[in-house]
Amino acid sequence: MLLIPAIDLKDGQCVRLKQGDMDQATVFSEDPAAMARHWVEQGARRLHLVDLNGAFAGKPRNEAAVKAILAEVGDEIPVQLGGGIRDLGTIERWLDDGLSYVIIGTAAVKDPGFLRDACTAFGGHIIVGLDAKDGKVATDGWSKLSGHEVVDLAKKYEDYGVEGIIYTDIGRDGMLQGINIDATVKLAQSVKIPVIASGGLSNLKDIDHLCAVEEHGVEGVICGRAIYSGDLNFKEAQALADKLGAA
């Protein structure tokens, strides 16, 4: 089970939001590259970046911070980025800059043809971000709810060659209320694409629960507020996941 620290970028700073609300941002660091270094030192094997301004604007907005992170740790571990990625040119630029994966969210829902083209052009580098509220997929920085069911959409993407799906339960994001295990497993069992859980990770019990369903295709979890607030010790959590995975 891969534990992936999240670095959410807003106006060049590392922040955490509650339920995707840009007005409820807590700044955790003004130096995202130093934060990236910290997580690598704590044993992170991959980093998850989100360009929050980009997600709302529909184009990259935190390039300087992302490039600083890549310069700091990009040669050591894979880095993935979501937010504002809506065209092939943007994907190409980010991969050239050193990202290992780009996460396509809104554009995958609104324009499946674009997702298919991206997978064809950049096979092995495309992850889909499906963000859901009560089973329905949200878009545009979570500000709009589509009529699509998560599982139905995921099944559509199966033959595109998507590298993974990050499934976020919006209602739990940043609330430290625990991962929505049932919904995550339901999705993972419905598709052959590896699923990464997100939204609500709060303590070691969640790690226990996730490792218990790893065999169903849940291969990782995004760690957000809990590792910043101190509710979860990242190093300890990854060690537990490794131990349970080896059992």
Swiss-Prot record:
<keyword id="KW-0368">Histidine biosynthesis</keyword>
<keyword id="KW-0413">Isomerase</keyword>
<dbReference type="GO" id="GO:0005737">
    <property type="term" value="C:cytoplasm"/>
</dbReference>
<dbReference type="InterPro" id="IPR011060">
    <property type="entry name" value="RibuloseP-bd_barrel"/>
</dbReference>
<feature type="active site" description="Proton donor">
    <location>
        <position position="131"/>
    </location>
</feature>
<comment type="pathway">
    <text>Amino-acid biosynthesis; L-histidine biosynthesis; L-histidine from 5-phospho-alpha-D-ribose 1-diphosphate: step 4/9.</text>
</comment>
<dbReference type="InterPro" id="IPR006063">
    <property type="entry name" value="HisA_bact_arch"/>
</dbReference>
<keyword id="KW-0028">Amino-acid biosynthesis</keyword>
<dbReference type="InterPro" id="IPR023016">
    <property type="entry name" value="Isoase_HisA-like_bact"/>
</dbReference>
<keyword id="KW-0963">Cytoplasm</keyword>
<dbReference type="GO" id="GO:0000105">
    <property type="term" value="P:L-histidine biosynthetic process"/>
</dbReference>
<dbReference type="InterPro" id="IPR044524">
    <property type="entry name" value="Isoase_HisA-like"/>
</dbReference>
<dbReference type="InterPro" id="IPR006062">
    <property type="entry name" value="His_biosynth"/>
</dbReference>
<dbReference type="InterPro" id="IPR013785">
    <property type="entry name" value="Aldolase_TIM"/>
</dbReference>
<comment type="similarity">
    <text>Belongs to the HisA/HisF family.</text>
</comment>
<protein>
    <recommendedName>
        <fullName>1-(5-phosphoribosyl)-5-[(5-phosphoribosylamino)methylideneamino] imidazole-4-carboxamide isomerase</fullName>
        <ecNumber>5.3.1.16</ecNumber>
    </recommendedName>
</protein>
<dbReference type="GO" id="GO:0000162">
    <property type="term" value="P:L-tryptophan biosynthetic process"/>
</dbReference>
<dbReference type="Pfam" id="PF00977">
    <property type="entry name" value="His_biosynth"/>
</dbReference>
<feature type="active site" description="Proton acceptor">
    <location>
        <position position="8"/>
    </location>
</feature>
<dbReference type="GO" id="GO:0003949">
    <property type="term" value="F:1-(5-phosphoribosyl)-5-[(5-phosphoribosylamino)methylideneamino]imidazole-4-carboxamide isomerase activity"/>
</dbReference>
